Amino acid sequence: MSEEKLGQQYLAALHQAFPGVVLDEAWQTKDQLTITVKVNYLPEVVEFLYYQQGGWLSVLFGNDERQLCGHYAVYYVLSMEQGTKCWITVRVEVDANKLEFPSVTPRVPAAVWGEREVRDMYGLIPVGLPDERRLVLPDDWPDELYPLRKDSMDYRQRPAPTTDAETYEFINELGDKKNNVVPIGPLHVTSDEPGHFRLFVDGENIIDADYRLFYVHRGMEKLAETRMGYNEVTFLSDRVCGICGFAHSTAYTTSVENAMGIQVPERAQMIRAILLEVERLHSHLLNLGLACHFTGFDSGFMQFFRVRETSMKMAEILTGARKTYGLNLIGGIRRDLLKEDMIQTRQLAQQMRRDVQELVDMLLSTPNMEQRTVGIGRLDPEIARDFSNVGPMVCASGHARDTRADHPFVGYGLLPMEVHSEQGCDVISRLKVRINEVYTSLNMIDFGLDNLPGGPLMVEGFTYIPHRFALGFAEAPRGDDIHWSMTGDNQKLYRWRCRAATYANWPTLRYMLRGNTVSDAPLIIGSLDPCYSCTDRMTVVDVRKKKSKVVPYKELERYSIERKNSPLK
């Protein structure tokens, strides 16, 4: 690799702090470094890079590498954002017989969900992990069956259930464990992505919260590794999310392109960036409309959705469909932008800028909006730092993080970029970040269309080399989507790890809910802009009366809007 390798100073500091601990080091790209370290030093190394060198834990995953090196492997991917911007992945090999490695979570809380998932999917034991509950697997899943092991199962067959009961224990961190009685309630499996929230309350005040997701886990990673070719996974990644699918397919294709050293033409890169910003527009306007709805301002809700329709028209003009599916391929993009389409898109962007400004002025001058959002759902900057939050969540808590600026990808190195942050740490701050990002997206769309490079759209004729790996990433509306791909020797992926932005934000929701009222819960959850379709139920536990009640989500939503006739009474 002839280009200058970034991250040398971090590596030197690591060698000085931990002599002899780094067993191997390799660059996948000029700014992506993977180091293999001695397993017993894993927590100390990750903590050192995280807190002392300015890293953020972007994704954590396992890999069954017994066919390659005789061991399992666990990867901790850190985005280095203090000084030189680069990626450092800390890798450890886990003995295939012992199956244990030291947990990083006690030192770096951001590792908690990733380590729980590695335990679920591979049966690897993070020794010292504070929360050993299942994360992904259901209660009735067999104990010794681990889906992502290479020799474990056929993804098309689901094993027979081992129990009919729901055994998951919801935890009240700030109360007595005897209050944690889990009621058995209905889950409507016809819903796209049900979730169960449990609020521990004293009267109307939320003492703590816990929640369980993954009720409809799709098993995409196993599907990709066993049944799909490289470009077929591109279309699967498009469908990770109904709103930010193009961000996921961009992150996936970029991961393979980085692994193979494929240089995507500049025109294709710029088109990717333009479409990512169109996707950001309709996502942010949707969230702003929902914020109006949760505060009882339904005229604002309808007006934001009216303006959002313009962004959907942009997508249809540029891509042929209101959803930007099926455009990315490894090596470039499938469809060019026509001159007349770009002219029409510029006109729509100008109109949208005027419409959004009018709506924002109306929104921020509405008294009820200020009363319901200022000081509500606070996310302390230290909590956001400890858990490596992303997107408007972390930016609204004083951390100016944005992958488009920190690690410019596709065409963003050529676009005018401004990172927005707020200091309020509350719901209104998250709304303001999204509002400012809407204006920035419109500016980038205009600039990209005016300065679209010439040249081809695709690179073709390359050969996939087995067992190459690299990261790909994109700044989706909710934060960065991180993909890691390792090529296989059968024209399929050996391993694909897909981490959506909301996955990085869920663990801190309980901190945002604490100290607020039950009627604020839907608004606080909505300010996270969670990437799931519905919440079927919420259980409210009165820690003083030691009673629990299952509240349908529609009833909680009504209470959030009307703030009368409490469902708890």
In which residue ranges do the predicted regions lie?
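Metal/cofactor-centered catalytic core regions of large enzymes
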Residues: 42, 135-146, 151-569
